[in-house]
């Protein structure tokens, strides 16, 4: 009987600890995705540095150039930050950046703004509905959609660099 009570007490304690961990998870979500945006920032800025002078290169007709991909990332960061903070996007497409230094600065600024928006979300904010690309989704869904897309563009940018004989800075 004593053994059963001890085991029961251990189970109750374990469940109580798990409940507190589950309740703490959402804040970890914001921190983890803020960190992911920071990692993407470093990698895209690094690629923009080593691909300077090759921004117009593209593997073929009808696909984005190196610079087009970087400009898209900046635009996506702005769209997502606006969606997460409730700011209304004017819909005006910014002029394409072609200068390597300005590109690096714009990438850095766009990711800093995005990280601030992500880490500023409350747990309840994650479930707030927003419209992104004409679709209704939660802020958490919008965050996942854009960051997944950016990881694909990171792979694309790495392939573009390697096709030009350029090694990504973190691979050296």
Predicted regions and their residues:
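Acidic/histidine-rich alpha-helical segments that form the ligand environment
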Residues: 44, 98-131, 137-152
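A composition/secondary-structure signal for short, hydrophobic, low-basic-content segments
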Residues: 3, 19-21, 149-152
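Positively charged n-region of N-terminal signal peptides that target proteins for export
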Residues: 1-7
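Short, contiguous alpha-helical
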Residues: 34-48, 54-92, 131-172
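Boundary of Sec targeting at the N-terminus
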Residues: 23-25
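Short, solvent-exposed loop/beta-turn-alpha elements that line the ligand-binding surface or hinge
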Residues: 95
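Bacterial N-terminal signal peptides
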Residues: 9-20
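Terminal, regulation- and interaction-focused segments at domain boundaries
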Residues: 28-32, 102
């Amino acid at each position: 009987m004593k053994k059963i009570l001890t085991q029961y007490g251990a189970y109750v304690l374990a469940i109580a600890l798990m409940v507190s961990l589950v309740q703490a998870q959402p804040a970890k979500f914001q921190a983890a995705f803020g960190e992911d945006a920071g990692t993407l920032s470093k990698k895209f800025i690094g690629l923009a540095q080593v691909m300077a002078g090759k921004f117009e290169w593209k593997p073929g007709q009808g696909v984005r150039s190196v610079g087009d991909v970087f400009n898209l990332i900046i635009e996506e960061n702005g769209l997502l930050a606006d969606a997460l903070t409730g700011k209304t996007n004017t819909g005006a497409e910014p002029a394409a950046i072609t200068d390597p230094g300005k590109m690096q600065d714009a990438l850095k600024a766009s990711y800093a703004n995005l990280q601030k928006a992500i880490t500023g979300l409350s747990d309840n904010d994650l479930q707030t509905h927003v419209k992104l690309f004409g679709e209704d989704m939660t802020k958490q869904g919008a965050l996942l959609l854009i960051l997944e897309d950016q990881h694909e563009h990171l792979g694309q940018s790495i392939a573009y660099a390697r096709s030009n004989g350029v090694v990504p800075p973190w691979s050296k």
